[in-house]
A protein has these predicted regions:
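Feature captures the catalytic ectodomains and active-site-proximal regions of enzymes
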Residues: 1-507
């Protein structure tokens, strides 16, 4: 291929649905994307399971998707890495984990396990929590307390009760008691909405919340009030009108979420800095996290450190002296920067980053356009100026609005993306760019369960890939997300590094 400039457009959450009645994308008016099937070479990509480094049958997500897209290979995800470590006994013998356990044992301190209790596999997995309680039991600990964050976003909105019952039944032959229950909306914020985080902080450290006899009754009560898992207000398990356990100075805490973004804030308020305006003060804790949430955190131990990914697309472009732009709205900005760069925070030489602020609304069904038009207005002039050799652009709508499960809003989200993509592709073709139009995973393609209830999770469906070029009309074969980067380098006429083990999808 000659020296092409390329644009990767990621329509986040846009999959190929198999059930028309559940597929907001098929129900939406998408004249532009629909027209591409007849005009340009296209195929599908797998975004889930072992093809993206997850366990078989595990749905993909934005973090995994962008890592694979940028790395040009299958990137083994923390979920799979931890599953294997449990199987081989590597987790039980892990130095950071053992030092937390031994600290609690030697100093007769409580050990708290914090995290998302579900099998969503995006942020955590209930099997990891069960393994941790078993390891604590083998070590002879008896003061083990679980602070359960309920999901309802990567799992069905009312699946939390089942997960809590599954955990309770495991604890009967293991060690540990559930001390509090809080919806992830509060405990796992990532947008610096400290007023939400404060509810979780006060529950964990002061026992502030609805007093309940057990975790299951807290969830049942929430359901009775029509509150789903994600939004459950803190509930505190009490005995004799006192919380059975709160996090106190000197305790050991293990946060078992493996995805780094959504337990960063709760870790920050517990261990890193005071927020006096919210009456949140850091505690001296023996604090351990499953993975490294933030490399600037002090006195936080890490069970699994990152394997550094080298020779990602961004790094190869830097080595070739090429310029690149990464652009997204707030919700997906870390994905086109940090994750697309293989877990690297710092921009590459020649890389510019552009962000449009996501709208400040409680949930995105209230503004399904999100900031797509602003993004488009920012990137089209850059394309017209041909200011970058490569552009990575993410439209968040089909995913973020899909997560609300609101059908009409999802349709509006998809239609917004269609019109924005049309503007980008038109500008690209006028200015000599080749566009790779794809998605990182599905979501809006399956929004209704068989019983008609909303499905808010990602899907296992493949996603489309269009290669849109003024002249090129070759064959493109089906593949996986990790095949995109080498295919882009092929179009740009840049040698593909051996580390990029993905396939080139064109002949």
């Amino acid at each position: 291929m000659e020296n092409k400039k390329c644009i990767l457009v990621i329509m986040d959450g846009w999959g190929h649905g198999a059930v028309k009645d559940s597929d907001a994308i098929q129900h939406a008016q998408t004249p532009f994307v629909s027209s591409l099937y007849a005009q340009y070479p296209n195929t599908t990509l797998i975004t889930c399971g072992e093809q993206v480094g997850l366990p078989e049958g595990q749905m993909g997500n934005s973090e995994v998707g962008h890592l694979n897209l940028g790395a040009g290979r299958i990137v083994y995800q923390e979920l799979q890495r931890i599953n294997v470590a449990i199987r081989t006994g590597e987790l039980a013998n892990n130095e950071s984990l053992q030092s937390a356990i031994q600290y609690a044992k030697k100093n007769n301190k409580k050990l708290h396990l914090l995290g998302l209790v579900s099998d969503g596999g995006v942020h955590s997995h209930i099997s990891h929590l069960k393994a941790l309680t078993d390891i604590c039991q083998q070590a002879g600990l008896d003061q083990v307390f679980i602070h359960a964050f309920t999901d309802g976003r990567d799992t069905d909105p009312k699946s939390g009760l089942g997960f809590i019952q599954e955990l309770e039944s495991h604890l009967k032959q293991s060690v540990g008691r559930i001390a509090s229950v809080t919806g992830r909306y509060y405990a796992m914020d990532r947008d610096k909405r400290w007023e939400r985080v404060k509810l979780a902080y006060d529950a964990l450290t002061k026992g502030v919340g609805t007093p309940v006899a057990d975790a299951a009754s807290a969830i049942s009560a929430a359901y009775a009030d029509n509150i789903t898992d994600e939004f459950i207000k803190p509930a505190i398990i009490t005995e004799q009108e006192k919380p059975i356990a709160v996090i106190e100075e000197g305790d050991a805490v293990i946060c078992f979420n493996f995805r780094t973004d959504r337990c960063r804030e709760i870790t920050e308020v517990l261990t890193q800095q005071d927020f006096p305006e919210f009456n949140m003060h850091k505690l001296h804790l023996e604090y351990t996290t499953m993975t490294e949430y933030d490399n600037t955190f002090k006195h936080v131990h890490v069970i699994f450190r990152n394997d550094n990914l080298t020779h990602t697309l961004g790094e190869v472009l830097e080595q070739q002296g090429k310029t690149q732009i990464r652009i997204a709205e707030t919700e997906k900005y870390p994905h086109v920067t940090f994750f697309f760069s293989g877990g690297r925070e710092i921009p590459f030489e020649g890389e510019r980053r552009i962000m449009a602020a996501s709208p400040k609304v409680a949930t995105y069904d209230l503004q399904p356009e999100m900031s797509a038009h602003e993004l488009t207005d920012k990137i089209v002039p850059e394309i017209q100026a041909q200011s970058a050799d490569f552009i990575c652009l993410n439209y968040a709508n089909a995913d973020m609005v899909g997560h609300t499960g609101v059908w009409q809003a999802a349709i509006k989200a998809v239609e917004t993306v269609d019109s924005c993509v049309q503007q980008v592709v038109t500008a690209a073709l006028e200015n000599g760019y080749t566009v790779f139009l794809t998605a990182d995973h599905g979501n809006a393609d399956f929004l209704k369960n068989e019983d008609g209830s909303p499905n808010t999770a990602h899907t296992l469906n493949p996603v489309p890939l269009f290669i849109i070029d003024k002249e090129w009309r070759g064959q493109v074969k089906a593949g996986k997300l990790g095949d995109i980067a080498p295919t882009i380098l092929h179009f740009m006429g840049i040698p593909i590094p051996t580390e990029m083990t993905g396939d080139v999808l064109v002949s």
